[in-house]
Amino acid sequence: MNASALAENRSESAGRLRGLARRCRELAEMTMVPDVTRELLSIAAALDSEAERDSRR
């Protein structure tokens, strides 16, 4: 795999992770269970962090 294909693949991966994080935040807004809300927001933060790491490589 060449360098540009690798960079594109990382960008797509980071985008998917950010999309999942966004969906977790949306679900957190919909739920009325505080523990579930906290867990979804924690997952969203972890996904955002991973996306940021992917985009920097």
Report the location of each language-model feature:
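Long, non-catalytic architectural segments outside compact domain cores
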Residues: 1-57
